[in-house]
Amino acid sequence: AEECSDLMKGLQYEALFKLEEGERPLRVLSLFSGCGGMDLGLEGGFACHARSVSNSEWIQQPLNAQWMLLKRNRFRTVFACDILPAARLTWLRYMRRFGIDPSVYHLDSVVDLVKRQAEGQAVFPSEVDVVTGGFPCQDFSLAGKRKGFDSAVSHNGERRKADAGDIPSEETRGKLYMWMKQVIDIVRPKLFIAENVKGLVSLGDVKRIIQRDFSAANGGDYIVLDPQVLHAGNYGVPETRERVIFIGIKRSALTPEALAALEREQVPAAFNPYPAATHGCTVRDPRLARPVTCRDIFGDLPEPAESVDLAQQNFSGAKYMDNGTQGQTEILLDGLAPTIRSEHHGNIEFRRLSA
């Protein structure tokens, strides 16, 4: 496949990424897959700034003085889905370097997929080890209207017609985590990971309700640990992004020692699946690496005319205006980038980042 990345061009992925002899891949079922952020994190084999890497054993090879190619992990995505065609195209364009079959990605709502499975179709794969899902966040986000479970949007992206008497249901966007729970009921993975925005934590009892509902999966056979809010800056990513993570582990897949440890009020570090901070952003510890900044990441970007990356070559001529309106934010090179909004309102257009 033609490589459109300045860093990754010319790499022979088939030769680089091979499982050790006798090593079994861990099969991942991905829901709400989008363009593959969570999937890529599990798969590995991506480019990463050297300052973001806290363990040299994770490095496959240097790409240049600043950027490293990480080793591929044992995780293999065997199922992915989303309702956005552009997301599927992006996912396939990237994942094809690993030889993943395009049929793995289903352009369907999780609601429709679960319904087809209930009708007798073999929709979901067997022997799934991990289920992941960043269930839709718009109804919980501080940047949105915070409708929560009372979402005005259906599972397929269509807006409910309030004036027509439509009422919220299990199929509205704010309740799609329940359909993720149904997938867990069906495939019974050893582990599941669900992700959403930090704003969910402060929206009434939403966090507690979601944790309780996930705990009921497969007849209560899952320990769902207390959700934690993780800050990207504490893990070598130059963003202020904060996300709440739910982790559920199948009781029957655990050793007695691990089960007892995970059921304790304070889970011992040796058994805690939540990662410890590697960089000192919001965590103050002199033993941690300094935060990675935007200057570290953007400092060696080639000029558009010198890049083979089409996304770098083509850009809007719109200019930064220091007037406080939406989208008028500068990136602080010696700090962390804010979360870039995924939607906008009004007659505006995309522009290059200002730093």
Q: In which residue ranges do the predicted regions lie?
A:
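Helix N-cap/coil-helix junction residues
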Residues: I100, G219-G220, S342
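Extracellular structured ligand-interaction cores
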Residues: P25-V28, V78, R241-R243, G335-A337
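C-terminal target-recognition/interaction regions appended to catalytic cores
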Residues: A1-M8, L26, L301-A355
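Generic structural motif
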Residues: A86, R251-A253, E343-H345
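Core alpha/beta nucleotide-donor-binding catalytic domains of modification enzymes
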Residues: E3-R188, K198-G204, R208
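Short hydrophobic-aromatic micro-motifs
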Residues: T132, I245-G248, P338-S342
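Class I S-adenosyl-L-methionine
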Residues: L113-V128, Q138, L142-L333
